[in-house]
Each structure stands twice: as structure tokens, then as C-alpha cells.
Amino acid sequence: MSNIAFYVVSDVHGYIFPTDFTSRNQYQPMGLLLANHVIEQDRRQYDQSFKIDNGDFLQGSPFCNYLIAHSGSSQPLVDFYNRMAFDFGTLGNHEFNYGLPYLKDTLRRLNYPVLCANIYENDSTLTDNGVQYFQVGDQTVGVIGLTTQFIPHWEQPEHIQSLTFHSAFATLQQHLPEMKRYADIIVV
């Protein structure tokens, strides 16, 4: 049996550097680069590890606000995320704050799979995959990405008008029988 670690980064909200940008000389114990440094140091002790982005990365910092206002592209943010070598990610509710075209462009640029099994556009999931399997030695790890179905309660309707949000719980129940057949370890 392999020694496996799961590292989850969540709610980064575009804070790449260890600062909240309120002053020039401020250092905070936060940010994607600092989290990645800690993860990379720790993961050496495991046979296998997974680095996961749990969503809410696309909106929330002055950096993200600058990108949408001045370039209309998330490319600089995506460049950082791609260099972090995530194994997979999922969507948070704030990924929808700048509209669906901006989100889709971001998803196309990411170099890791973004899993979301319960948000649909027309008849297929918004992301390429909802469930993915990874082989780790003699074990199979099954991963399902789920996002809150309550996004329509607080997101601007024009940002999500072509999407259908299914219950995360019901979606998990639907996928679990198959995942249990194929996976030794299930990650939600």
C-alpha cells in the first residue's frame, strides 16, 4: 500500500503573493506561492501526493480586479496556477463572478483537469470531466468534483443563464456506486 497525501488549496481568491496589497511593506502568511512552497517541502515524504485546487481562485483580490478591468484575461493568474503543477481542481462559487465566457477561457488555459460533476451547460457537464481516476501503485483513486448548487441564489443571472446546477449531494449519490466499483480510495 502506498503512502498518499492530498494537499488542498482553497479560496486563494487571486492572492498569489504573501500580501493583501494594502501597503508596500506588508507580509502576510498567505498566498498561493507560500502555500505551494510549504506543500512542495512536505510532499517529499510521501510515495505519492496530489495537489488540488478546491476553487474560488479567479476573483477576490486587487490583482484579479486589475486583470478583468484592464486586460479582460486571466492569463497572468493562470500562468501562476499552471506553474504550481496541480493534479486537478474544481470550481468554487466565485469562479462565476466575471461571467461564463471569462470562466471558460480560463478553463481552456489551465493545464490540469478541473472536475465538476454537478454543473451542466445544455446536456453535458460544464467542465470536461466530473469524475477522474488515478492509478497509484496497486490502488485506484477516484476523484469527483462538486460545487455548491446554491450559486443561482447569489450570482448575477446573466453570468450563469445557460447553466443548470444540480444538488451536490444527489450527484455524489448518483456517482458513488460506479466509483466504489472502480476506486479503492474516493476523494470528494
Regions found by a protein language model. Give the residues of each.
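Acidic, metal/ion-coordinating pockets
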Residues: 1-188
